[in-house]
Amino acid sequence: MLEQPYLDLAQKVLDEGHFKPDRTHTGTYSIFGHQMRFDLSKGFPLLTTKKVPFGLIKSELLWFLRGDTNIRFLLQHKNHIWDEWAFEKWVASPDYHGPDMTDFGHRSQKDPEFAASYREQMAKFDERILTDESFAAKYGDLGLVYGSQWRAWHTSRGDTIDQLGDVIEQIKTHPYSRRLIVSAWNPEDVPTMALPPCHTLFQFYVNDGKLSLQLYQRSADIFLGVPFNIASYALLTHLVAHECGLQVGDFIHTFGDAHLYVNHLDQIKEQLTRTPRQAPTLVLNPDKHDIFDFDMQDIKLLNYDPYPAIKAPVAV
């Protein structure tokens, strides 16, 4: 089945992973250096051994493609993946006068009373982002995140580079180039970024009328993050191939530190007891050609029949 490389990775980390402390103080079992390969001609690699919310993957990727860095677009599509990073800026500002939200990530997981207050303040924040344009402009923007790095990389000359737009043009005009690369890792920006990019660099490859993509991911949360990453970059491969008039080839996923958090071990073991089902099929709007013009309704998934979702805490 198409998702077997993911299940093999999870089992390998359970069997061979080294225990490491980490930034979140949760603890992980990790391996360093691993590669998975998915033949996209055989289906779309959205996991079936647990339900993965494809709508969130679509809206996040469209957000990146637009070069958008403000969570307002995500909230308009009921996507809360990036809320905490903007909320952190808001509660640390002199304009915030609500209850103390210091270290809200850890406290909300350990203190039920605080968690209720946190949810209330986050709901108020989200609503204000959606309804107050000036507030959204000030506190909804995350700055140098993927959309900015892909579509408007800031140079030392003071201008910007549309890396992804340039690479798509290169695929059309020089498909066999070995420079079809987009990078999100800028050492100058890393100290001030909302979250230094986990998926740091990707490269396209054209052969025999097929487009393949390889992603290098420096840090990978196997249970919660990697299923999203697989589907997101598979979708990106499909979209770029669609615009360039190519078929899809492989998505190759290369990892640096691939890890399972200690508080995800029971969940991944449950997932590994499930037999994978047939992969779904991706359908793109044939009347749209420029990937930067795609909307949510232009991307559809057919025959997705997953097992139920498995909940797990996010390490913060």
From Swiss-Prot:
What is the species of this protein?
Lacticaseibacillus paracasei (strain ATCC 334 / BCRC 17002 / CCUG 31169 / CIP 107868 / KCTC 3260 / NRRL B-441)
Q: Which Gene3D superfamilies match?
A: Thymidylate synthase/dCMP hydroxymethylase domain (3.30.572.10)
Mind listing the UniProt keywords for this protein, alphabetically?
A: Cytoplasm, Methyltransferase, Nucleotide biosynthesis, Transferase
Task: Report the function annotation for this chain.
Answer: Catalyzes the reductive methylation of 2'-deoxyuridine-5'-monophosphate (dUMP) to 2'-deoxythymidine-5'-monophosphate (dTMP) while utilizing 5,10-methylenetetrahydrofolate (mTHF) as the methyl donor and reductant in the reaction, yielding dihydrofolate (DHF) as a by-product. This enzymatic reaction provides an intracellular de novo source of dTMP, an essential precursor for DNA biosynthesis.
Pathway assignment: Pyrimidine metabolism; dTTP biosynthesis
Q: Where does dUMP bind?
A: 23, 178-179, 218-221, 229, 259-261
Member of which family? Belongs to the thymidylate synthase family. Bacterial-type ThyA subfamily.
The subunit field of the Swiss-Prot or TrEMBL record says: Homodimer.
Write out the GO cellular component annotations.
cytosol
Origin superkingdom: Bacteria
Q: Which residues bind (6R)-5,10-methylene-5,6,7,8-tetrahydrofolate?
A: 221, 315
Main localization, broad class:
cytoplasm
> Where does the UniProt annotation locate this protein?
Cytoplasm
The molecular function terms of the Gene Ontology recorded here are: thymidylate synthase activity
Catalytic-site annotation from UniProt: 198 (nucleophile)
Q: What is its EC number?
A: 2.1.1.45
- GO biological process: one example: dTTP biosynthetic process
Provide the protein name.
Thymidylate synthase
Catalysis performed (reactions):
dUMP + (6R)-5,10-methylene-5,6,7,8-tetrahydrofolate = 7,8-dihydrofolate + dTMP
Is Transferase among this UniProt entry's keywords?
yes
